[in-house]
Regions:
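RecA-like helicase/translocase P-loop NTPase motor core
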Residues: 1-198
Length: 198
């Protein structure tokens, strides 16, 4: 778990995470969220399917698909003194309807602490919708792969940089290179463009 695939865009990261999860041994567990509208919204009450289809920034997906052994990342600060901060990486050890048991990714080969995570209530932004709503879900997302930006501040033994297209922001490549502790732990996956050039 002291390794990751880094990519410049969320779209690439989501596809990579899904591909790695499918290859991981074990049975997938689907964990749906509980979504609800806060207060009355009159006659324009959204249907549950609409809420389930939404994935605003800062809110977990409606359906979280995990396996034991999956690498996940916290999406919210839960308890900073215990290392449970937004961006912390963990390995799923057991999956329950209301509790995930995970182990923090250790540093320098040392095993991390085992923690239990509960579902939390997340609130929609008042500016994005004509009504307020909440989603109760585990505050994690898959993290076999992550965006280069999200990897800032982390140090890993092995990093694969996946570049299906050029980086779009100045300094992104430097950030990706500097995540690995030693140059021998760095790998690249470059995809040729339509003309066959890298």
């Amino acid at each position: 778990a002291d390794c990751a695939i880094l990519a410049p865009r969320n779209k690439d990261v989501e596809a990579l995470n899904q591909a790695v999860l499918e290859r991981l041994a074990g049975e997938s567990v689907v964990l749906p969220s509980a979504d609800e509208v806060v207060g009355g919204v009159g006659e324009h009450r959204p249907n549950p399917e609409f809420l389930h289809s939404q994935h605003p920034s800062g809110m977990a997906a409606h359906e979280l698909v995990l396996k034991v052994g999956a690498v996940v990342m916290l999406t919210h600060n839960l308890c900073q003194p215990r290392g449970l901060c937004n961006g912390s990486r963990l390995v799923v050890r057991s999956i329950g309807t209301y509790r995930l048991v995970c182990q923090l990714v250790g540093v320098d080969g040392q095993p991390g602490r085992v923690v239990a995570l509960s579902r939390i209530r997340m609130y929609s932004s008042k500016t994005d919708y004509a009504f307020e709503w909440t989603r109760t879900q585990f505050p994690v997302r898959l993290a076999f792969a992550m965006t280069i930006n999200k990897s800032q501040g982390q140090s890993m033994e092995r990093v694969a940089v996946y570049l299906p297209r050029p980086c779009f922001a100045h300094g992104q490549l430097y950030v990706a290179f500097s995540r690995v502790r030693h140059p021998s732990g760095l790998r690249f996956v470059l995809m040729p463009n339509d003309a066959g050039h890298f």
